[in-house]
Amino acid sequence: MTVKEIYDKLRSCTGVTTDSRKCGPGLMFFALKGERFDGNEFVRGALEQGCPYAVMDNKELFDSQDQRMILVDNVLATLQQVAALHRRTLGTPVIGITGTNGKTTTKELTNAVMSTTYNVLCTQGNLNNSIGVPLTVMGLKPEHEYAIIEMGASHPGDIKELVEVSQPDFGLITNVGKAHLLGFGSFEGVKRTKGELYDWLRGHNGIAFVNRDNEHLQQMCKGLPLVEYGKPGQEGLLVEGEVLECNPFVKFRWRRGGGDWHTVQTNLIGAYNVDNALAAITIGLKFGVKEQDASDAVANYMPQNNRSQLTETGRNHLVVDAYNANPTSMAAALENFSMIKAQDKMLILGDMRELGDVSQDEHRRIVEEIRKYGFTQVWLVGSEFAGAAGDSGFRLFPDVEAVNSALQSEPVNGKTILIKGSNSIGLTKTITNL
């Protein structure tokens, strides 16, 4: 069966699902395979629960007499191809967002700004991979006026795969930094992979939103029509802005090309988030959002999922940024934490994963950053930091369980604490003891 024929059947359905636990009438089931499961084994159950069709790639489980079963060579590839056809069919303008750091926050801010004026489809959570992107695209409906699609990557070619599904008309790379080096091989590999978004835009008459102050992006975006934002005093920017204070929440000001200044008090922690806010405002203004609406949307945005959140426990003030960590974001978090006015500061930092051969070097650099800012109450969690700490005198813990044991025997009170590390370290498990 061709992709077009599958899509025609899909149009009689109410939606799609890849989760056998969420099957029901009206939903087309795509039987994806994972490391620990094979969706083909759940096809019969999905049909019994009312799914009108199930797309599968296991010939042994396929019943040619059952017209509800659709056999293909590869279910994931078919899901992506059907999503791409759906995107082409509707023709909704798509804004693609990627980057090493800040892409999810920027996506959420952009959605907040654009939603003041338009009916917007936006990636939910961090569904930004080879499965999440096509599922998001499949959610497009005729009433959507714009789509904001977040795209993540950990290996070369990942963004190329995702732009072929989402087919963005406009693109934003928040930044490029040292993350997933195990998969990318090098920082140059990061740049090439993230730059696959620019490559798509070049080949399809697209437009890029670019930070004028980011030298790497300025080199990467050559040959593209640009809409730019950045620090004040530069010619040709649609939006210019600057940090006013971080104590601990960011306040900044911005204006449109020489116009009146807007001052925005955010619920965001980290001066680096000003670039994310400026990007969202720039995108909004490009599509006709009113300036005050853009400011209000950014001011009212509340961060979620342990991304630069301030948590008051009654005993301590926690700056929780434990969703992910890489050398670029860790250095930025330390710089920002050094700017926060607090009497008694403490760090609980976890290993940065997926750095490959440069892992020890990058962890040593972070240890030097900690020393540079003069932090003394420092707890480091994981084997990479243990190997990099040297004679720093910082407290070392093999895992989060050891941290919790220490917190229970030595209660911590009255401190402002930065909690940051790769999500897999599990640092959020310490919060109940803080």
Give a label for each model feature:
Residues K4, A77-R212, H216-P225, T432-L434:
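Phosphate-binding loop of NTP-binding sites
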Residues K4, E60-Q65, L172-H317, A342-Q343, ...:
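Acidic, Mg2+-coordinating active-site environments of NTP-dependent enzymes
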Residues S20-A31, V120-L121, I131, L135-A147, ...:
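Mobile, glycine- and charge-enriched loop segments
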Residues L27, A46, V82, I97, ...:
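Residue-level signal for inorganic ion chemistry
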Residues L32-F37, P303-N306, A322-G393:
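Active-site beta-alpha connecting loops in nucleotide-dependent enzymes
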